[in-house]
């Protein structure tokens, strides 16, 4: 299913999330199972299925990584269950530096400053990746779609590392 069509958007990485939320509420009202309470069982089942599609579509389009994965899947590139790893040596080196910095936080003289520094480093790198991804996803070239898939893999890794950093920060606050 093309969630961009469902929500009446052109396939694009940058979307108006406020408009997405508005269209989500409209679709929810239109397909909500309560609206079909007095209809046939088949109609009720269709309503439940349609509601699930609307919910999944909304969750997919509101999350930048899932949105990019969806755009790539519409072009025949499936990333959701893959095990392909990033081959960019520069990124792999940066990844190792981040991991080391993450491990060193607990022994730091100022753990919060170290955490803030890592968050800032993540934000800068993520902004660069997102800018490149936006450009690659607007291209019609098959090679650019493969490069976009690599950017998504990097963003997925960064999201996991960001979650780890948040857990470390939470543990320090406890």
From Swiss-Prot:
The keyword Chaperone applies. GO terms for biological process: [2Fe-2S] cluster assembly; protein complex oligomerization; protein folding. Residues 2-74 form the J domain. Gene3D superfamilies: DnaJ domain, HscB, C-terminal domain. One of its GO terms (molecular function) is protein-folding chaperone binding. Keywords: Chaperone. SUPFAM superfamilies: Chaperone J-domain (SSF46565), HSC20 (HSCB), C-terminal oligomerisation domain (SSF47144). GO terms for cellular component: iron-sulfur cluster transfer complex. InterPro entries: DnaJ_domain, HscB, HscB_C_sf, HscB_oligo_C, J_dom_sf. Belongs to the HscB family. Interacts with HscA and stimulates its ATPase activity. NCBIfam families: hscB, PRK05014.1. Co-chaperone involved in the maturation of iron-sulfur cluster-containing proteins. Seems to help targeting proteins to be folded toward HscA. This is Co-chaperone protein HscB homolog. It comes from Shewanella baltica (strain OS223). The gene is hscB.
């Amino acid at each position: 299913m093309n969630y961009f069509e469902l929500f009446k958007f052109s396939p694009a990485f940058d979307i108006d999330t406020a408009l997405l939320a508005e269209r989500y509420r409209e679709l929810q009202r239109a397909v909500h199972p309560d609206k079909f309470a007095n209809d046939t069982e088949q109609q009720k089942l269709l309503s439940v299925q349609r509601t699930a599609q609307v919910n999944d579509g909304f969750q997919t389009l509101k999350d930048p990584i899932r949105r990019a994965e969806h755009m790539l899947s519409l072009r025949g590139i499936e990333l959701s269950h893959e095990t392909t790893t990033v081959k960019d040596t520069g990124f792999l080196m940066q990844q190792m530096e981040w991991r080391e910095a993450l491990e060193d936080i607990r022994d730091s003289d100022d753990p919060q400053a170290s955490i803030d520094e890592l968050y800032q480093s993540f934000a800068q790198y993520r902004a660069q990746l997102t800018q490149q991804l936006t450009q690659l996803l607007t291209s019609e070239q098959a090679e650019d779609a493969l490069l976009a898939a690599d950017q998504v893999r990097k963003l997925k890794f960064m999201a996991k590392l960001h979650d780890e950093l948040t857990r470390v920060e939470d543990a320090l606050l406890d």
